[in-house]
């Protein structure tokens, strides 16, 4: 069996990626999230496949087909709850994975980082089109509001929006194509994940200290397979607790009402994992400016490798940068809270301050802190 593992053309690739992979001996639980994201993706594809067997992408029957899945299909309620809450777990792991990358300087593996940002955007697109499918009130109005943002593009905006809608409003054509996108995008994500891993295994993983780990490597199996299984158990326990005890906690009550173009919900807001970007969008009183800020809030991640000024890779030995990183974390907890609040004072001003702080920390303050820490490293005698 050992020979087959090392000689068979297919099994050899798996062996080099998950079994005999040389891994740094000191990577912490923060390095668990890559494998957790892989498991999340598998769960989402499998539950999504079973939901697609019973779902109909027609405006007249979409809402009732979801109700039918929950009431009449064997364990349909469980599959749907796992799929809906699985998305929340996916994004939770994604945000922690990106945060780990920023804290420990993983972004200096530029190819891996850039593919990761593309993956983040693709997952966000998949989640957005997926949220439209149950055809509840928030599905319909969320689709209307977010697709309408494209009309802010000068000259071609209105044409572009109508092209995406497939008509003059969000209707049957929109729902059908969103279902098609929601079905195909996860497979594109799988392909991107393979490329992400390919680039990662070119360089190997970084580690908390930020120094070259080549002199001290251990095989991935059994050490990190066991460690990842612990993280997996914790994640699955959390997901099952959510799906079985409070499946609707993270959803919007408005989505229990069928979509009606004649009835606007009092507060249109996306799922919690988009609220940080939604808060930044709303904090700018100009439509085009808001759309650009929304895009910048995610695309700014592509600039992070270029803004690295420190002589050290990780934040482990950089107290000033650590303080700024945790300020950024606090800011990214404040923004979703603001995104879920009505547009009135004092939430407007808090959102604007939080948005300015978000961009300032990444573009100005953290690079300056890196330079200051470099200066403090120099001997003064």
Curated annotation (Swiss-Prot):
Cofactor requirements of the protein: heme b
Q: Which Pfam families match?
A: Cytochrom_B_C, Cytochrome_B
The source's superkingdom equals: Eukaryota
Membrane-spanning regions, if any? 33-53, 77-98, 113-133, 178-198, 226-246, 288-308, 320-340, 347-367
Residue ranges the record marks as coiled coil: none
> What topology does it adopt in the membrane?
Multi-pass membrane protein
Entry keyword annotation includes Nucleotidyltransferase: no
Subunit and partners: The cytochrome bc1 complex contains 11 subunits: 3 respiratory subunits (MT-CYB, CYC1 and UQCRFS1), 2 core proteins (UQCRC1 and UQCRC2) and 6 low-molecular weight proteins (UQCRH/QCR6, UQCRB/QCR7, UQCRQ/QCR8, UQCR10/QCR9, UQCR11/QCR10 and a cleavage product of UQCRFS1). This cytochrome bc1 complex then forms a dimer.
Add the further remark from the entry: Heme 1 (or BL or b562) is low-potential and absorbs at about 562 nm, and heme 2 (or BH or b566) is high-potential and absorbs at about 566 nm.
What the protein does? Component of the ubiquinol-cytochrome c reductase complex (complex III or cytochrome b-c1 complex) that is part of the mitochondrial respiratory chain. The b-c1 complex mediates electron transfer from ubiquinol to cytochrome c. Contributes to the generation of a proton gradient across the mitochondrial membrane that is then used for ATP synthesis.
The entry's protein name is: Cytochrome b
Species in which this protein is naturally found: Potorous tridactylus (Potoroo)
State the encoding gene: MT-CYB
